[in-house]
């Protein structure tokens, strides 16, 4: 044997040992070995179960073995020539296998263990996702419950505030009493809980609108009574001045009021201290005080009718002009001689006219159809009334009270007709001088400064 052949035998054996070591390491891996065993078992079982398939597989095995043997025989010279390169590749493959075994520990485990571990990981992941979904569902349920409770609290508090600031009317109390008489009717709180949020909110808005409308009309009627009370006292004061100007000894008014108090003070004074100038001055001071009080009432009426029809605003403007004319007539007077007779007659007519205008003002407001405050999905039961309630004025009178009976003796319609006839004909029963002075006062009557009107739905709701 030559030296070259002797040298090649050891190198060939070393390469085969290294190659065998690499192959053995790969095959010896538990995962690979278990997988190959499982595949072989399935393959053998398939061949035994199907004879035709088994014959074909055995034939294919023989062919593959023959082809592999021949290929190795022909490739042997090439493999011997590439032995150094193959050895290097084998070494690199071994290093890569070592690193792979470190990074993938499951390669050292059988396939059953790997499959079981994978199942456990998947099951734990699915369980985590399911738990997260359950927590999210539980959180959404709690959030819904919290929102529902918050809405209930807000609605209940709103209903309590409405009941406190806008008490129930007689109609609502009668309806509740009729419902309470039924054998199977629950309480008001139970009925409210059974209703939906939108229905409760719509009912609340309709109730607020109805109660606030009645409340606002009641306040307007109260202002009307206050204004008419002041006008009645002012009318008696003007009559007192007229009687004293004509030289007629006036009698004490039978009705209580500021004029009655003034006469009571005069009656309690001793005769020597009753000076006519002092009485005249106090009467004029009383007239100016009543006029200023009337101006404040008119300002309240003006703020209440902003945004209402032009007819209501015009009535208040007429009252304002009458009050301003009275204020101008009595502004500089220190005694009865400073008040012209024509101005006094004109003032009495203006007071009567203002009284009638205040009466007509409330009638216009009561007859006006109120606009709905809330429309859309949050007001499912709001329906605009085609006409106002027929007994609304009577219901308001029950709360506010009717006209003051102290001034029932004043014939306001007759005084109003006399004032209108005097202005229509241009001449009255008095002398021409009185009418001339009255005409001058009318011409010099200051105009009410115009101010921008703020239009609102229900401006009288300033409570």
Curated annotation (Swiss-Prot):
Record-listed Phosphoserine modification sites: 2, 148, 322
Region (Interaction with LIPE), start-end ranges: 1-108
Predominant subcellular localization, coarse grouping: other
The UniProt record lists the keyword Cytoplasm: yes
A Pfam family this chain is assigned to: Perilipin
UniProt subcellular location: Lipid droplet; Cytoplasm; Mitochondrion
Domain of life: Eukaryota
Residues covered by region (Essential for lipid droplet targeting): 1-173
A biological process term (GO) from this entry: positive regulation of lipase activity
Gene coding for it: PLIN5
Protein name: Perilipin-5
PTM comment text: Phosphorylated by PKA. Phosphorylated on serine in skeletal muscle at rest or upon lipolytic stimulation.
Subunit annotation: Homooligomer. Interacts with PNPLA2; prevents interaction of PNPLA2 with ABHD5. Interacts with ABHD5; targets ABHD5 to lipid droplets and promotes interaction of ABHD5 with PNPLA2. Interacts with LIPE.
Role description: Lipid droplet-associated protein that maintains the balance between lipogenesis and lipolysis and also regulates fatty acid oxidation in oxidative tissues. Recruits mitochondria to the surface of lipid droplets and is involved in lipid droplet homeostasis by regulating both the storage of fatty acids in the form of triglycerides and the release of fatty acids for mitochondrial fatty acid oxidation. In lipid droplet triacylglycerol hydrolysis, plays a role as a scaffolding protein for three major key lipolytic players: ABHD5, PNPLA2 and LIPE.
Keyword Cytoplasm annotated: yes
InterPro entries: Perilipin
Tissue: Expressed in skeletal muscle, liver, heart and kidney.
GO cellular component: cytoplasm; cytosol; intracellular membrane-bounded organelle; lipid droplet; mitochondrion
UniProt region (Recruits mitochondria at the lipid droplet surface), positions on chain: 444-463
Family, as annotated: Belongs to the perilipin family.
Residues covered by region (Interaction with PNPLA2 and ABHD5): 185-463
Alphabetical UniProt keywords: Cytoplasm, Lipid droplet, Mitochondrion, Phosphoprotein
Record's note on what induces expression: Increased by endurance and sprint interval training.
GO MF, one annotated term: lipase binding
The organism of origin for this protein: Homo sapiens (Human)
